[in-house]
Amino acid sequence: MKSLKAKFRKSDTNEWNKNDDRLLQAVENGDAEKVASLLGKKGASATKHDSEGKTAFHLAAAKGHVECLKVMVTHGVDVTAQDSSGHSALHVAAKNGHPECIRKLLQYKSPAENIDNSGKTALHYAAAQGCLQAVQLLCEHKSPINLKDLDGNIPLLVAVQNGHSEACHFLLDHGADVNSRDKNGRTALMLACETGSSNTVDALIKKGADLSLVDSLGHNALHYSKLSENAGIQNLLLSKISQDADLKTPTKPKQHDQVSKISSERSGTPKKRKAPPPPISPTQLSDVSSPRSITSTPLSGKESVFFAEAPFKAEISSIQENKDRLSDSTAGADSLLDISSEADQQDLLVLLQAKVASLTLHNKELQDKLQAKSPKDKEAEADLSFQSFHSTQTDLAPSPGKASDIPSSDAKSSPPVEHPAGTSTTDNDVIIRQLQDSLHDLQKRLESSEAEKKQLQDELQSQRTDTLCLNNTEISENGSDLSQKLKETQSKYEEAMKEVLSVQKQMKLGLLSQESADGYSHLREAPADEDIDTLKQDLQKAVEESARNKERVRELETKLAEKEQAEATKPPAEACEELRSSYCSVIENMNKEKAFLFEKYQQAQEEIMKLKDTLKSQMPQEAPDDSGDMKEAMNRMIDELNKQVSELSQLYREAQAELEDYRKRKSLEDAAEYIHKAEHERLMHVSNLSRAKSEEALSEMKSQYSKVLNELTQLKQLVDAHKENSVSITEHLQVITTLRTTAKEMEEKISALTGHLANKEAEVAKLEKQLAEEKAAVSDAMVPKSSYEKLQASLESEVNALATKLKESVREREKAHSEVAQVRSEVSQARREKDNIQTLLKAKEQEVTALVQKFQRAQEELAGMRRCSETSSKLEEDKDEKINEMTREVLKLKEALNSLSQLSYSTSSSKRQSQQLDLLQQQVKQLQNQLAECKKHHQEVISVYRMHLLYAVQGQMDEDVQKVLKQILTMCKNQSQKK
């Protein structure tokens, strides 16, 4: 019989088997049918990890087998299952750039916001891969776009690092943080400059990337663009920096105020200074001090030699504190220079130069106070003047070391105290080394600052030359003069710095040989003071000249910008004015030509009247009746012609009135500058109608003129006929010639006028087209006055209605905001409930697995119970056999008793027989009772087995029942062992 462990041993479903190997191979080959058949087999699971931590589900996502993924999901695979590195299938699909797999997984409710062990979402991997479709899908399914991984990278930074500009554009359009930083403080703009992607840099700048941000090492985007050596990116950044600087120029006085506030705050709360050591004196720092300070006599118990009075000593200490405050303020300004970007250094340098000038003035005031207090303190004054010069030098340097300034300032500002003759050489060596280190630092920083200044000046000169080429020659000459002056100031500044370095070298030599060459230092004192003063003056002049030159350059730049703006704004206005003037001149010319034509028409009418008069005078009084009829016909024709002429004159007057109205409207339009499109169309329609009428009038005039000519010819014929009868030939010829000449002149004039009129009509058409285009361009944005007056009342009512609607919409918006907040809270609660449901589902799944295991155990126990029932049935059969044997023995005993009774009856007494019979009867009763009890127990056991079997089939076995079954099995085992 099997052991109890073998009965209750549960099969380990997580063990790797052959089916799992086959499943991996099928997924590798992309065989969806084989995957489906293998998943139906026992022990095969798509989320089971192999030795490398890989699963079949993740392999399908990595290979991009969509059909395999479908089959696995339909077989109940957990979509959120992770591999050994915490990647879900969505992470793997995004990492390998399979948008179809991503779409399917998102359809199967795979969460897009899940992160792996490195804190990355699927969007991080899609951005790193540069797959635009994958990025779009994940953004549509609300993947967090500004979530940082463990390295501090958001998807935008990852896309920029890998140079995927399209993904960067998409992420920026969907709300990615432009100024987000990683662990090292680098922004997306810095990374784009480092990779040399000009398109990405342009997109980031357009989206508002901050160019003044620096990383943890203090480098800005311009530094990274220099590393990539991309000139296009550098020019782009410099142009943006210059634009920002132009926008910030009005706020420069505020910056100056802020710097002054910082310096005042620092001066208001001075730092604690360490007292200088007693052996150090001003003679150890400069050879300009007097040898009187180096004496072998010890200090007196009250005061020093130079500062004998207590108030004077207090004032000197206050001066020293002021100097320390000033040095602190300059150090603060230097720290501002270190923090600021390269583009703002020039502006801050101007502010600091102004600050240097104020500091020198303050030093001069302090020197004047010292001179007023004690005329004997020339050595202290020389020290103070040298200290002021040193402060100007530190202010002009871009970022001098604070540690190198503190000992020098303390040593220089210390009062000249006498020291004993036994000064140690170690202190002098330490001071010399400190001064040498500070000098080296100053030289390096001066060189770096000069290089940066040259770069900035070259860039400024290039920009200025580009802008100044557009301007006149005067500005270019001024710019060249200013550049020459700047170069001269730079050369002066360099010469001054060289002289300062030579003086400092002489100071070092004086420090090394101060004990042996006191007389030499005394001789060099006066020229050193003079050199320092001259250098100070030269330096101040150079600084002032450079400031003036910069101011002039800025003024010229502002003037140039104003001129460019004026030139940019002027041409359209001038063009409009020229068009208006040309249009007005054309209209005036047309009116003049019409007046000229009207005059010509009147002249022609006068000539016709004259001809009629001459005809009347020349007609004979004794004319026949036919001539009277002809006269009447001619008079009728003349009347008709007069009527037509009057009608034409009326039409002309109407056209002239319309022209005057049009002129008035045009003047009103010019006063109002523009008209509405509808009004313009109406005016154009009126002008077209007037032009059509004028053309019709002209055509009618031409037709009438032709009729008049025809009539004139007829009249001439009649006159000729009459003249043949009555008038002389000479007069007739003269009249004919005059008429012909006048007719020819009239025809020539008419032809010239028609050609001129055609040209003018073409010009009018061109001008009308131009005017229509201009007014169409302008009228879209203008409102007509007529419609404005009509719509004003309606608009006011609409405004009131809209105001009420706006109030209602504001209320509704507030309600909507509250509802949105409620919805958000409900969504958060729903998410929490979803998480709780997921946890409950996981717990239920665990319970289901436990129940399945229990069911398997119950099945095994049922099998054991069946075996036990078989054994119990065998036991019952054995018991039945025993009972039968017992009954047989009882019968045998009865027979024996009967035989014994017969024998005993014959041999023994009756009393003994009765006792034996009683004993045998008692034994028989006991055996019968035992049989009945065995049957009852057997029935009870069978009923219990049946009940437990039913519970096991229904899956409702209790722990107590399991314990009882185990006990039964142990009992059966013990019984079998006993047998």
From Swiss-Prot:
Where in or outside the cell? Cytoplasm, Cytoskeleton; Cytoplasm, Cytoskeleton, Stress fiber; Cytoplasm, Cell cortex; Cell junction
Q: Which residues carry this modification: Phosphothreonine?
A: T249, T295, T297
Q: What is its main location?
A: cytoplasm
Q: Which keywords does this Swiss-Prot/TrEMBL entry list?
A: Acetylation, ANK repeat, Cell junction, Coiled coil, Cytoplasm, Cytoskeleton, Differentiation, Nucleus, Phosphoprotein, Repeat, Spermatogenesis
List GO BP terms, alphabetically.
Answer: cell differentiation; spermatogenesis
Disordered as annotated region, ranges: 247-299, 392-429, 446-467
> What InterPro entries does the annotation carry?
Ankyrin_rpt, Ankyrin_rpt-contain_sf, RAI14/UACA
**Gene Ontology CC, one term:** fibrillar center
Q: What is this protein called?
A: Ankycorbin
Q: Which Pfam families match?
A: Ank, Ank_2
User: Where in the sequence does UniProt note compositional bias of the Polar residues kind?
Assistant: 282-299, 458-467
Q: Coiled-coil ranges per the record?
A: 349-374, 430-943
Q: Which SUPFAM superfamilies match?
A: Ankyrin repeat
Q: Repeat among the record's keywords?
A: yes
The gene that this protein is the product of is Rai14
Positions of modified residues (N-acetylmethionine): M1
